């Protein structure tokens, strides 16, 4: 099962962090960025898009991709660092809610 959660505080803030964990993480990130060239264990500067309509969610974001088992959860893990406005946070969470199970804080710890 793939999960996601807002790992930082709720906006508004300078930056918000969303984590995704599970076997489909890379594929989800490729859909969000419209890129197959996501480098592992490096900071990827990218744009995040809504895969349903192609609208830009965040034009200047960071993506960190950690393949399992060498990640915090032991599974494939991505950390999405986005602008911390409520509009950007809500847009990304809305897209992810259509694709993934929403985790609570304990889900990542249990993994």
How would you name each of these model-derived features?
Residues 1-103:
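A glycine-rich (often HGG/GG-containing) alpha/beta subdomain
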Residues 101-111:
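Single conserved hydrophobic/aromatic residue that forms the stacking wall/gate
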